[in-house]
Amino acid sequence: MNDLNELKKYIQDVKDFPIKGIVFKDISPLLANGEIFRIVVEKMAEKVREVDVIIGPDARGFIFGAAVASYLKKPFVMIRKEGKLPHNTIKIDYKLEYGMGSLEIQKDLIKPGQSVAILDDVLATGGTTKASVELVKKLGAKVTKAVFLMELEFLNGKEKINAEVISLLKY
């Protein structure tokens, strides 16, 4: 696939979901097509070959992050909502559109000095990604890239992220 914009036909707009006034980008058709999903994994992998660790935020970041990490034979580390990870974790509180949220990561899975890439489905306001970057920084590592299937440019989330931002698709 030479033109990545062809991927857009596998992403459906769902009006008024999850609440009235929102147009949700449903990636289910893309994930349900093995060949198309493989193309996305390969394209994302091209962008992060040189990093040491790949992380993905709860929940759709797990899909892309784990697939790309496996493809590249690199470690994958989950970022989860508070209280969902065992063992020693560190936490960060961050602002959501409608309140506050908390994210956690396990302390021992990323080492100081490692380069890290965040992979996720969509870059919207940038709040989750910014918080994820801060969590990695607390561990002494550095997020060098944030790679997304799609970016909602009108929300300006890219401006909040202190790393190279790469989006396969832009809306």
Swiss-Prot record:
A single GO cellular-component term on record: cytoplasm
Example GO biological process: AMP salvage
Record-linked InterPro entries: Ade_phspho_trans, PRibTrfase_dom, PRTase-like, UPRTase/APRTase
Reaction catalyzed: AMP + diphosphate = 5-phospho-alpha-D-ribose 1-diphosphate + adenine
EC number: 2.4.2.7
Enzyme's top EC category: transferase
Places the protein is found: Cytoplasm
Entry keywords, A to Z: Cytoplasm, Glycosyltransferase, Purine salvage, Transferase
Top-rank lineage group of the source organism: Bacteria
Pathway connected to this protein: Purine metabolism; AMP biosynthesis via salvage pathway; AMP from adenine: step 1/1
Pfam families named in the record: Pribosyltran
Family listed: Belongs to the purine/pyrimidine phosphoribosyltransferase family.
Oligomer and partners: Homodimer.
Role description: Catalyzes a salvage reaction resulting in the formation of AMP, that is energically less costly than de novo synthesis.
Protein name: Adenine phosphoribosyltransferase
Classification of source organism: Bacteria, Bacillati, Mycoplasmatota, Mycoplasmoidales, Metamycoplasmataceae
